[in-house]
Curated annotation (Swiss-Prot):
The lineage of its organism: Bacteria, Pseudomonadati, Pseudomonadota, Alphaproteobacteria, Rhodobacterales. The chain crosses the membrane at residues 46-66, 100-120, 129-149, 156-176, 194-214, 253-273, 296-315, 330-350, 365-385, 394-414. InterPro entries: Cyt_b/b6_C, Cyt_b/b6_C_sf, Cyt_b/b6_N, Cytb/b6-like_sf, Cytochrome_b, Cytochrome_b_C_euk/bac, Cytochrome_b_N_euk/bac, Di-haem_cyt_TM. Component of the ubiquinol-cytochrome c reductase complex (complex III or cytochrome b-c1 complex), which is a respiratory chain that generates an electrochemical potential coupled to ATP synthesis. This is Cytochrome b.
Length: 440
């Protein structure tokens, strides 16, 4: 798909022309900052800059933290305490890094759900969406391995439980688990591997972010209406767009400042609110915590993992059909990874010709029920797997898969969309034009 017509950088001085012929970096920066952006973007589109800030924060604080960290089972916990007590500003660096991960995931979940609501995955933006899902998977892997590094009780037992999932794969599971751990159990080789990968993956994420930005700069940004920018000429495109600089940069920086006020308040006044007290106890393989839970951003999928027990009829059916090869544990692993995979497949599961949920009356109800379902699964994932909680988790898991595999494909067939604006300019004038906001 051709890019949006716009003015490109033209070198004016002799030096600029000389540099442009050899390294057109000024042109690259100009085209990035001055890219035409739909003028009707709302606050849902501010989270990109929050994500960029979080990535830079995590890499910067992480680099300093590893200068003082020792990846050895006998020294890791003590080295973290050394950072907290003896390194100048060490406690602040650690709290920024830990809470920065939470802000990172909060922003990415809002970013994903915004994309699901406004149809940012639909053609021609499928590649942008898939690269975004790859970034999310890399974030999950990086965060999990980072959670193991402090070598507290929850770090150790969380690693034991999650790596144990690979052992559920029939036939080759135990061999894969041993290969991942570097031995029969979570120990020093595991810690060293996780430390190395935790340091490496943020740079892989940064590279994928560049590809992600490149992809949506090629196709153009989506917008609340889902209507494409007119591309017949520069004049037409200018009626639907504004340059990214200064309009959206200033808006995004203001939004980032508001988010950071809340973020630094949490870091300064309740930095351990989202953590777990058991992780301030050094790892002990002989003492199992009463309740093993991952970080909050993994809880929805952890709830799905635990929801499918041996007494669930669908598990019993699959177990019987597979001649006992797929047991409840392996079924839970499939369900957990499948819950993430269906989000990557949503460009082909959504059959509606209308991109934005703003004009889909039936879709809105099912979508917001999905958002509630996600929060409920997060809550259930933090609860013990007893009493009514497994039933709630099972119901939440069922709706999650039903939404993507049944409801979304059917809605595109049966739903009658509302009237849509023909252009972004029309939508913008309807909301922000002089008729809408008359001068006083």
């Amino acid at each position: 798909m051709a890019g949006i017509p716009h003015d490109h950088y033209e070198p004016k001085t002799g030096f600029e022309r000389w540099l442009h012929r050899r390294l057109p970096i000024v042109s690259l920066v100009y085209d990035t900052l001055m890219i035409p952006t739909p003028k009707n973007l709302n606050w849902w589109w501010i989270w990109g800059i929050v994500l960029a800030f979080c990535l830079v924060l995590q890499i910067a604080t992480g680099i300093v933290l590893v200068m003082h960290y020792t990846p050895h089972v006998d020294l890791a916990f003590a080295s973290v305490e050394h950072i907290m007590r003896d390194v100048n500003g060490g406690y602040m660096l650690r709290y920024l890094h830990a809470n920065g991960a939470s802000l990172f995931f909060l922003a990415v979940y809002i970013h994903i759900f915004r994309g699901l609501y406004y149809g940012s995955y639909k053609a021609p933006r499928e590649v942008t969406w898939i690269v975004g899902m790859l970034i999310y998977l890399m974030m999950m892997g990086t965060a999990f391995m980072g959670y193991v590094l402090p070598w507290g009780q929850m770090s150790f037992w969380g690693a034991t439980v999650i790596t144990g999932l690979f052992g559920a794969i029939p036939g080759v599971g135990e061999a894969i688990q041993t290969w991942l751990l570097g031995g029969p159990a979570v120990d020093n080789p595991t810690l060293n591997r996780f430390f190395s990968l935790h340091y490496l993956l943020p740079f892989v994420i940064a590279a994928l972010v560049v590809v992600h930005i490149w992809a949506f700069h090629t196709t153009g940004n989506n917008n609340p209406t889902g209507v494409e920018v007119r591309r017949g000429s520069k004049e037409e495109a200018k009626k639907d767009t504004l340059p990214f600089w200064p309009y959206f940069v200033i808006k995004d920086l203001f939004a980032l400042a508001v988010v950071l006020v809340v973020f630094f308040a949490i870091v300064g006044f309740m930095p351990n609110y989202l953590g777990h007290p058991d992780n301030y106890i050094e790892a002990n393989p002989l003492v199992t915590p009463a309740h093993i839970v991952p970080e909050w951003y993994f809880l929805p999928f952890y709830a799905i993992l635990r929801a499918f027990t041996a007494d669930v009829w669908v598990v019993m059916l699959v177990n019987w059909l597979s001649f006992g090869i797929i047991d409840a544990k392996f079924f839970g692993v499939i369900a957990m990874f499948g819950a993430i995979l269906v989000m990557a497949l949503v460009p082909w599961l959504d059959t509606s010709r209308v991109r934005s949920g703003q004009y889909r009356p039936l879709f809105k109800w099912w979508f917001w029920l999905l958002a509630v379902d996600f929060v409920v699964l997060m809550w259930v994932g933090a609860m013990p797997a007893e009493g009514i909680y497994p039933y709630i988790a099972l119901a939440g898991s069922a709706y999650w898969f039903a939404y993507f595999l049944i409801i979304l494909p059917l809605l595109g067939i049966i739903e009658k969309p509302d009237a849509m604006p023909q252009t972004i300019e029309e939508d913008f004038n309807a909301h922000y034009g002089p008729e809408t906001h008359p001068a006083e």
